[in-house]
Amino acid sequence: MTLFERPKPQMGTQDDVVLRRVGGFVIDFVVVAVFGGLLTGALSLSPEGGSGVLALLLLLLLLYFFVFEGTYGKTPGKHLLGLVVVTQRGEPCEYREAAIRSALRVIDGLPGALYIVGLITIYLTDDRQRLGDLAADTVVVRAAERGERL
């Protein structure tokens, strides 16, 4: 399965993907941080610029998740760890759901709180959903094996 296709979900696997979700987020965060660092350098923004650089990185992070999840149902981090975002009914995560998930990432990840709100919500909900998932009616599940697509 390639990054640029929507894999078929394995519904009912949301309980066993929590650590993969964390790993996928770490991968995605590193990708955005590296890209943001390069962009900051290219735009000659000073890291000491504080809030401007942080705002740019937050915007990049939100756009990254919105574009990848809305287009492919997964980010590169989720892809590498065999995960996909779908609706509770097993339908593809579209741009509407991706926008809701991305917007609520700000609360799930409260700056400086290391995603503690999202992690607590994931552990307290039956379908292992963070606030963005609950609002968008989505779940993160394992992707089907190679060759199976939505």
Please give the residue ranges for each predicted region.
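Membrane-interfacial and juxtamembrane segments of integral membrane proteins
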Residues: 1-150
